[in-house]
Amino acid sequence: YSRATMQQTAPGSTFKMITAFAGMNEGVIGVNDVIQTKGYFDKTETPAKCWIYPSAHGTIGISKAIEESCNYFFYELGYRMATKDTGTYSDITGVERLQKYAGMFGFDSTSGIELPESKPQISDADSIRTAIGQGTNNFTATQLARYVTTLANSGTCYDLSLVSEIKDIDGNVVYKNEHKVHNQLDFPAEQWNVVRQGMRQVVSVHTSSSALINQINVAVAGKTGT
């Protein structure tokens, strides 16, 4: 039993970059827009709290929201995607929009790795909580790895593989593995930049690891997730 390929869990806040891309491409937030966040989101029948409640993160944009992992900011994006068409909240509308973008990042199928793997489950309920990686989202570590790789390389979503080549007993190559592209995401450069800037800030600004990370000659980015 491989935990990396079989054990599933909610991605939590690691999902928030998908919500950011969904919000930008669905036209509910611009790259440079800000949201006045509060600690308590009460625009739906099932209110939700930010992790910082009873405090709040104030007025922030996408990069800062990713850095601070502000739940309220992403609740608001989930809400806007659910109300865009009619002005009335439609949970399924918001969920379907988030499902669309999660699928683009590879969560619509197993990762391609040559091992038994659990089938990913993209959330099918609760647009507000789906937007922060909860709802019924359920993925494996390998599926999350493919998603993060897609973020890192500006939109090429590859199938994962453990096999480079296969040789026979005499050392002859009988199979040469070629990379397989699952999907190509053609988002504007400014969108990639604002999301990845937030991920960079996660590990480089006011964190317990920033002092260490800032000493190495490699640009590191990341995202918290609980």
Model-found features: residue ranges?
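Beta-lactam-recognizing serine transpeptidase/beta-lactamase-like catalytic domain environment
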Residues: 1-13, 18-226
